Amino acid sequence: MTTDVAPGTMENETSKVMSLKHKAAYVPPPIPHVEMNQLPLSLLLRNLTVFTAKEISQFFKLNVHTGGKTPFEKKLELLNMILFLRNQFLKLYVLVKWAKTLKQNNFHSLIDLLNWFRNANMQVNNCTMALKQILGTMAGAKLPNPDLATSLEVLMLGRPNLPNHGFNLNGSQSDNLTIPNKLILKRLRDLNTCLSIKISLMTIPSQLAKYEIKDGRIVFTVKDEFELQLSTIDQNSPLFFVNINLLFNERLPLNLARLEKHINEILFKSTNPLCLVYQFLHKYILTLQMYMIHVELNALGLNGKYSGGHLVHNYDSKKQIITIKYWLQSKIANTCKCVVGMDKETESIVLEWQNPDVNKETVTTRYHGLLNNIESIIDEITFNHAQMIRADLLRTDTFQEDNEDTTSTSLLFQIPTTCATVSQIQLKIDQVSGIFYFHNPSNLLLSYARQINQSSNTQDLITVLGRLKLDKVDSILRHMLDKTGWICSDVVRLKSSIVPSTDSTFSKDIFVKLKDWPSNWFLVLTIISSTNTCIVEKRIGKILSVKGVWKLKYMDKKNVITSKLDTMTYPKMLTLQISILNKIVNHMIIDSLNELKIKNKICTFTTEDSNILPPYIIRKDGKENTDNITVIALGLESFLEGSKALNTILESSMLLKIDYQKMDIELYGKFKTDNEMIRCQCDELSIKFLEEDSLSFFMSENFGNLNDIMLYLSKFRKKLTQLIALTDVMDTLHSNFQSMDFRVVELRPNEIRFKYLPMKDSPDNEDCVIRIVTNQEKVEKLDIKLSEHNPQAMIQRFLDEKEGFAHNFIFHYLQFTLPLFRASKEADYTSSSPSTVKMHLFMHSLQEFHFLYRNHKVGGELSFIIQLRSVVRTRHQENTQYFVRFAQDYSQPQLQQQHPLSKAIAEIQKNAFSLALLKEQNSNTTSSTTTAGTATAGATMISTASSNKLLDLQDSSPTNAAVDWSSIKCVRLGSALACSHDQILPLLLQFHKSISDC
Amino acid sequence: MATSHEDGSATHPNYYYYVDPSLPVYESQQPNPVDDLITIYGLEEVARQVARTNADGTKAVKLRKSYKNQIQDLSGRFITIPSRENGKGGEISDVIFQNNPDMMNQAKLVEGMSEEEYRDAMMKRDTGLFEPPQMDWDMCSTVIGQLMKSHPSEFKNSGFDVDDLAFDLNGTGTKTKKRKYKSNGSSMASPNTELQPDDMKRRRLE
């Protein structure tokens, strides 16, 4: 305080005292009583009383006559009325009591006062409104440099209330006392001395040790905190507060009055005032600083570098703690937190970076001197944090350090740009937001930057980058494939990748095909990418959409071509187009074979396997390029769908050879044994037998469309089935017709035409036609048709009557009964002159024939019954023999003699049937018939198995037909005879002879 | 300030500002709203009592809404206090706030009437209401006679509650309490005066 101010204050104080005195005498003007909407209490009472009296009299007047109301209703009405009136009086009673209380307590004055205030308020409002209106109307009026405060003073006082500093404006002598300067100076010096003595007697805390006494006051200076000025008036008085300056921020507005009050209180009361004052001020300043940090952070977070929600803080004024959170959008940095608080040891404000991952030995986590420095501290923390994350990522070996980057804030990541080249991509952390970003990003990188920032730990981030790399490789490969004419299918998506992704590798499948490929077949490129390498695996697979879900139907697991990404080139892609087709078809065939459940195996041309392949395939391949040839071994049994019986005819495995260059498909098979079929070439089957290996054959087709390959397979199968059926039938025929007359006229896949009759007996082209009726899989039946002029044609009827004869039986039967049918013709040949005897053969059944001889000359006829019976020779051997007897019993002599052909009967009876001749014949037996078997049951077996005789029979000609009874080998049974089939023809001829001789 | 102005007007020439000193000068409003009017008018005590908050900032005891305690000194036995909320209070304002002189008997100050006569006339202006022909007491007794004797149970289910009459039929009532209040000698008294400090204050005020 300066001396020249002192008179002013004194003057002020005196005026205050004066006004107080003035007030004591002042009687306040009466407050106007509120009268609006108010009625005197007496009037209220009177109103209610009048109303009540009128109500009551009204009631009685209305109810004096009974009217329609019952007494109860009237009573109720009366009671309700009384109740209502009584209640109103109750209210008035209470009102009177309240009014009394209010009056006693002067409460009405309070109401009046409130009303008065309201009025005053309203007036002020009106004034404001009027002023506003004036302002509006005076828009054009302007006052240069208006001093409204002074203007108001002039308006109110008639003059400005300027400080006169003790001078009298009109120049007259002032009555005011002036203190001489000398006195003031002396007083100040005295004060200095006084203070020096006083301070030396006081305990001074170490923080306040630095002080200076001047101008009648002590000035304590605490560095970076405050400058406190204290003074006193004399030796006995305590110290008083004079002024305080904050040293860290001088512009800060201070509530000096409150501080003064508080400090003076401490100085006055305390026994150790300076200590307490220091403590108080220190705390005060710390609190202030805390608040200033809060303000600074506010500015930083809202408008400064970290604006945009990257930095938030929470200022807890009670606990004196500020919690700062930075990098709010960053997920990978899990704890981004700093806490500003008091350090108890040093009693100063400290900032602690609370990150558990930080290495506290190398990185500072505690910061002092925050004021005006908070931005750079947060910068340092974010930088350190970014470095930590970067170090973490570098440790994963996915990244390289950027040597050109001097600030070492970026990471390099390698991404292939083509198959062979790799480019470095810079990944950086934004220090303000903690978000990763790519340097010069492409669209792909941008989308992945988003994913990278979503990842919450290093591993996730690496995974995202792995996916990024995979995506990139995928797009590179797709581009290459597109350019080389492959078609990448975007539609096909497998539920799970063929090679599942692991922690360190990522895989993705690309399904490609060429235009002319069979549908559903794809080349599957599987990209397997890890941090450092990238491999592409090529497989062939068939993928079908089943009910909207793509399913892998076939996958070549053995022949996986694995190549590194950097080996993939455009030329290779083009070559692949050519070389891959065979494989596709192979797999397609194998898949189809598998689907048909045909056993199959791909044969390779490697040397160790070559001995498995038959030489005829090897030989051909010696000249040809084996690359275009595929050989697949097929299981015969499964190929022909399980007809095991056929295995006896053909070798169990077949070879399918596909030549892609010639577009040929060939099926090779081999017979187990030599058979008749091999010699009868059937052109229509187009089965060719190999020259080198007579048992091997092959079928060949030229394919136009790869999709139809399976058609050829079924064609082959049909042919093969026919071939086998044919072979089977042919074998049977050959074994049954073991004669020179047998000859196959025509051989077609389902028809065999052949001759078996001696040339002179068969006028037709063929004697018999066998049609092989097949269904899809096997031979259903054989249709045997005898030709029109075949003497045995009458058998046809019986064959047709009853189906299901084994063809073996039929052939045998035909061959066996042939002599019977030939007998009449043979008889014509033997007799030179036109015969008088006609022979007729009737067939009763397959077992029984009726032979009739008619002699025109004599006019008699003789018939025989010929039966086919099987004779058991030994236990395991049966033999079919002819049994011949007369149709009529001629055993009675008279019957015999009456018959015109009695002579023939007698002769036949005697020579053919009679047992009496047996003895004589036995003795006459020639040496050639030595093999007479032991007689069983009175029957003598005569071997007829003489090849000479057989030849004789077949070569029998009319010229040397000198047959007589003795040459016929048969078993005589008295009235019948049994003979084998080669004896029947001579026998019948002998009968003919006998009959014609009559 | 007024004093200094007077000094100024004496010392400065009139032309000094564009303000005519002869005109009536501004005088602050009386009473001055800037002053503590409550104190000036001696209303501190009553203001303190009805204040919504106590001196320490806590919420003060609410003012009563029910007038139950105010009518305890009456002879009735009020079980339910008629109020607007329970529908038994009825509307009074239109009865008591009518201010229509034509409907009321007026006493006129006729010339030559002494002040005493006028006051007498004023007092007796409404007596006519209770006398025939306005009120025929004979007719009243006739009608009452028609009503016959009643029993409380009679009014069951008729929408009328006998208790609302507040007749102290069995004589117990609240007489003991009533005496107690009377002994206090205060119409402001409430049954639990001693227990509530808020009410204590009020009573002391008187």
Curated annotation (Swiss-Prot), chain A:
GO terms for cellular component: core mediator complex; mediator complex. InterPro entries: Med14_N, Mediator_Med14. This is Mediator of RNA polymerase II transcription subunit 14. GO terms for molecular function: transcription coregulator activity. Keywords: Activator, Nucleus, Transcription, Transcription regulation. The gene is RGR1. Component of the Mediator complex. Belongs to the Mediator complex subunit 14 family.
Curated annotation (Swiss-Prot), chain B:
It comes from Kluyveromyces lactis (strain ATCC 8585 / CBS 2359 / DSM 70799 / NBRC 1267 / NRRL Y-1140 / WM37). Pfam families: Rox3. Keywords: Activator, Nucleus, Transcription, Transcription regulation. Component of the Mediator complex, a coactivator involved in the regulated transcription of nearly all RNA polymerase II-dependent genes. Mediator functions as a bridge to convey information from gene-specific regulatory proteins to the basal RNA polymerase II transcription machinery. Mediator is recruited to promoters by direct interactions with regulatory proteins and serves as a scaffold for the assembly of a functional preinitiation complex with RNA polymerase II and the general transcription factors. It is found in: Nucleus. Its main location: nucleus. Residues 183-195 have a biased composition (Polar residues). This is Mediator of RNA polymerase II transcription subunit 19. The gene is ROX3. GO terms for molecular function: transcription coregulator activity. GO terms for cellular component: core mediator complex; mediator complex. Belongs to the Mediator complex subunit 19 family. It comes from the Eukaryota.
